[in-house]
Amino acid sequence: MEDLLKRVLSCEAFQQPQWSEPSQLHDAQAYLRDSASLIRVEDILVLRATLARVAAGEAMVIQSGDCAEDMDESTPDHVARKAAVLDILAGTFRLVTQQPVVRVGRIAGQFAKPRSNNNERIGDVELPVYRGDMVNGREAVCGHRQHDAQRLVRGYSAARDIMQHLGWKASASQEQLSGSPAWTNHEMLVLDYELPQLRQDEQGRVFLGSTHWPWIGERTRQLTGAHVTLLSEVLNPVACKVGPDITQDQLLSLCERLDAKREPGRLTLIARMGAQKVAERLPPLVEAVRQAGHKIIWLSDPMHGNTIVAPCGNKTRMVQAITEEIAAFKHAVTSAGGVAAGLHLETTPDDVSECASDAAGLHQVASRYKSLCDPRLNPWQAITAVMAWKNQPSSTLASF
């Protein structure tokens, strides 16, 4: 494990916090290293077996949860409400697909976000941009926006509580599809949080102890970067977001790094193309990966490629664009011989107005906007998105 740590630390790492107090970082990392792993290696093996079934076309996947988690929402009530939405979406997806559904929450660690800019201007003041509760505060005050390493410990504590509320106290003894509890995943972004949580089992296998199923995003998928280097060597199943600008050669090289042994279900690719690009850009990528021998799970992230700005100035997403991308994604993957296995959604149990169900909704986006970062689907909109799986690419949605 020490060799892996050295390799990762020798690589360039993008989107990392600039901590204000190095001594606090040292203390936080020591705490994380000495803390109990949030997951067990036995659970990882169960999940990998389950995802092998998904890669074979025998089951589907629903991933849903906050864009950026609120660390204060680690109470039993908050967790139960989020899990309930995931259960509803999984049940709906099972009705639509007539297949078992693996439930996965964007939860218990989705506390950090990559950002396009390091700073933002609020009024006459330029401040560090908010990067998630694990890094800095949301309040538009300089002191709150400093990168605070003590938040790493708070993040671990919140994640631990959430895992317990989800039901991860008992051991996993069989493949879990629609059973409880839900699996957890988050973007593996802040290496000062992730690296101290590397663990090694009795057989010498290294696994990430912070989540069951880590993913990396468009901004951290550099082939020789620290994030890819780390994910390439952990026992966990791994995932990577794939946008419209990736080339076939880049994707094949990425798959070779993350799935060198070509193990079914080891690697999931989450397509975030945008409704206007998915039909053109995705099929050649799916075909290239299939011909290279990778048994990939393909998921659709229909959110990030369809972000626009509402008249009020808030970021939003049109539900119609989301449903159109879902239908086009399914057709694109299946027509190219891949396994279109499910959805990766940003959702909330709250009745928010962050995404617009129709043109009139664009003018109401700000009325109930609670997201810490990007716009999420409310429960009714999320059900609409799941139902779009049965649509043909040209279908239109029913408005809520």
Curated annotation (Swiss-Prot):
<dbReference type="GO" id="GO:0003849">
    <property type="term" value="F:3-deoxy-7-phosphoheptulonate synthase activity"/>
</dbReference>
<protein>
    <recommendedName>
        <fullName>Probable phospho-2-dehydro-3-deoxyheptonate aldolase</fullName>
        <ecNumber>2.5.1.54</ecNumber>
    </recommendedName>
</protein>
<dbReference type="Pfam" id="PF01474">
    <property type="entry name" value="DAHP_synth_2"/>
</dbReference>
<dbReference type="InterPro" id="IPR002480">
    <property type="entry name" value="DAHP_synth_2"/>
</dbReference>
<comment type="pathway">
    <text>Antibiotic biosynthesis; phenazine biosynthesis.</text>
</comment>
<dbReference type="InterPro" id="IPR013785">
    <property type="entry name" value="Aldolase_TIM"/>
</dbReference>
<comment type="similarity">
    <text>Belongs to the class-II DAHP synthase family.</text>
</comment>
<dbReference type="GO" id="GO:0009073">
    <property type="term" value="P:aromatic amino acid family biosynthetic process"/>
</dbReference>
<keyword id="KW-0808">Transferase</keyword>
<keyword id="KW-0045">Antibiotic biosynthesis</keyword>
<dbReference type="GO" id="GO:0002047">
    <property type="term" value="P:phenazine biosynthetic process"/>
</dbReference>
<keyword id="KW-0843">Virulence</keyword>
